[in-house]
Amino acid sequence: MLIAPKALSSSTLSREELAADKKEAVHYGHCALGKRAVYVGSFGLFSCTHYLPLTRVERVFKRLAVSKGFYEGKAFGTLSYLVVCYDGGKERQCRFEREDELDMMLSAFRSRTSIPVGKN
């Protein structure tokens, strides 16, 4: 691990736990899901620069938006975001280039954790 990811929550993992978990994490786009933490990218440019321990994550869901061209009558596309809610109301979103990768990550959340997936 060249650069250790920064914790977004007040709760953190030890350096050894973090290194082992990130090494075994399954990557989906700029994000990854490990056994102890979810790793999110920064501004869609860098992969896994921040992490949240799964014990602090309250729920995750998919947010869809449309590009500016939709409103101008030009070519448009959908923008897919993974939104992670943590620490009593804080949110972090990570943009995915491919919606199917986001769907695979949400499916992994459903099967590997007890964290609620979807809006309540």
Task: Name what the model sees in each region.
Residues 2-3, 59-120:
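Acidic, Ser/Thr- and proline-rich intrinsically disordered linker/docking segments
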Residues 20, 39, 87-91:
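Generic, low-specificity signal for short hydrophobic/alpha-helical stretches with a mild N-terminal bias
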Residues 22-25, 43-45, 76-77:
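Short solvent-exposed loop/turn micro-motifs enriched in small/polar/acidic residues
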Residues 27-29, 41-46, 87:
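Short strand-coil-strand connectors
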Residues 34-73:
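Phosphoinositide-binding peripheral membrane targeting modules
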